[in-house]
């Protein structure tokens, strides 16, 4: 994250990440959150938050109005994921997307055993999950290309460590830095 960046955090939850970026990197910006309790938590942290439904897109924001737009564990909850990827690239000079990587080897093993995976990043049973889609590192590469987005950097994360070798199989989280 660039020092002093103007940031938009989509699905910001309690605002903890944005608060940390403000404190440690001198960032400014907004969180967008739909949940009442999370909006209150943002306000209590001193994080500027807008209570909006991402199904309606980001039409309130001009092109390139943020240095960075974050979608950290948000994409898998969105019905309009493809639209929101394009919107992320439109309103931000760059976007950072992170999501649970369904192709991580323990997930594959669960499916081979006939069960949907339940992990730290996918902590719900199939019947009560807020995730409406699952994706893989490689699937996102294809999706970004299909939507005319440039992948500036991509890697996986596993137990706090960066995974660059075989991230589709070895990483529980996929992370992409994108732009138009």
Residue map of PLM features:
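Conserved alpha-helix/loop element of class I SAM-dependent methyltransferases that forms part
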Residues: 1-4
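Class I SAM-dependent methyltransferase "Motif I" SAM/SAH-binding loop
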Residues: 11-13
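Glycine-rich SAM-binding Motif I of class I
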Residues: 15-19
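Class I SAM-dependent methyltransferase SAM/SAH-binding core
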Residues: 20-57
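Short conserved loop adjoining the S-adenosyl-L-methionine
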Residues: 57-63
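A short SAM/SAH-binding and catalytic strip from SAM-dependent methyltransferases
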Residues: 68-79
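S-adenosyl-L-methionine-dependent methyltransferase catalytic module, highlighting the catalytic core
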Residues: 82-87, 94-180
């Amino acid at each position: 994250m660039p020092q002093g960046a103007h940031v938009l955090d989509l699905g910001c939850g309690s605002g903890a990440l944005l608060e940390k970026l403000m404190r440690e990197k001198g960032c400014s910006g907004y969180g967008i959150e739909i949940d009442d309790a999370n909006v209150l938590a943002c306000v209590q942290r001193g994080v500027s938050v807008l209570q909006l439904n991402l199904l309606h897109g980001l039409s309130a924001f001009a092109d390139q109005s943020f240095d960075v737009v974050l979608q950290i564990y948000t994409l898998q909850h969105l019905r309009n994921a493809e639209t929101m990827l394009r919107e992320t690239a439109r309103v931000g000079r760059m976007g950072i997307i992170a999501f649970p990587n369904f192709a991580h080897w323990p997930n594959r093993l669960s499916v081979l055993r006939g069960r949907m995976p339940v992990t730290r990043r996918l902590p719900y049973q199939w019947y009560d999950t807020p995730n409406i889609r699952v994706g893989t590192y490689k699937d996102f590469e294809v999706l970004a290309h299909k939507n005319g987005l440039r992948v500036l950097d991509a890697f996986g994360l596993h137990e706090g460590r960066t995974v660059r070798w075989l991230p589709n199989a070895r990483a529980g989280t996929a992370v992409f830095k994108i732009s138009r």
